[in-house]
Amino acid sequence: MKLVTSITVLLSLGIMGDAKTTQPNSMESNEEEPVHLPCNHSTISGTDYIHWYRQLPSQGPEYVIHGLTSNVNNRMASLAIAEDRKSSTLILHRATLRDAAVYYCILRD
């Protein structure tokens, strides 16, 4: 019998200047499965980078990844950026309980 653990990821709105991002309040996933965290940023300017941070319980924010116009990968996650840059998706490839956190999508130059 395989034990399936559910992971809840909380998301938060990020606002810097006039740029506003919107995300769902929370998402759930089974352990060891990919999690796709969407972020809409329709007011993005041409010089704004898309930054993702996460905050684990009882800790400060931690950098995850950032990008400008193309898709980006690192050891922690991938960032898929839409061609018009008005939305992006943070992808956690194999979520574990250690990934349960508040995730922030923020725009800044």
Swiss-Prot record:
Chief location category: membrane
Ig-like domain residues:
20-109
The positions making up the signal sequence are 1-19
Q: Name one GO biological process term.
A: response to bacterium
Q: List the PROSITE patterns.
A: IG_LIKE (PS50835)
- State the InterPro entries in the record: Ig-like_dom, Ig-like_dom_sf, Ig-like_fold, Ig_V-set, TCR_complex_component
Alphabetized UniProt keyword annotations = Adaptive immunity, Cell membrane, Disulfide bond, Glycoprotein, Immunity, Immunoglobulin domain, Membrane, Receptor, Signal, T cell receptor
UniProt key word ATP-binding? no
The entry annotates sugar attachment on: 40
Query: Is Cell membrane given among the entry's keywords?
Result: yes
Its Gene Ontology cellular component terms are:
T cell receptor complex
**Any idea where this protein resides?**
Cell membrane
- What Pfam family does this protein match (any one)? V-set
S-S bonds: 39-105
Classify the source by domain of life. Answer: Eukaryota
The subunit structure is:
Alpha-beta TR is a heterodimer composed of an alpha and beta chain; disulfide-linked. The alpha-beta TR is associated with the transmembrane signaling CD3 coreceptor proteins to form the TR-CD3 (TcR or TCR). The assembly of alpha-beta TR heterodimers with CD3 occurs in the endoplasmic reticulum where a single alpha-beta TR heterodimer associates with one CD3D-CD3E heterodimer, one CD3G-CD3E heterodimer and one CD247 homodimer forming a stable octameric structure. CD3D-CD3E and CD3G-CD3E heterodimers preferentially associate with TR alpha and TR beta chains, respectively.
Function text: V region of the variable domain of T cell receptor (TR) alpha chain that participates in the antigen recognition. Alpha-beta T cell receptors are antigen specific receptors which are essential to the immune response and are present on the cell surface of T lymphocytes. Recognize peptide-major histocompatibility (MH) (pMH) complexes that are displayed by antigen presenting cells (APC), a prerequisite for efficient T cell adaptive immunity against pathogens.
> What name does the UniProt record give this protein?
T cell receptor alpha variable 26-2
**Organism listed in the record:** Homo sapiens
Its lineage reads:
Eukaryota, Metazoa, Chordata, Craniata, Vertebrata
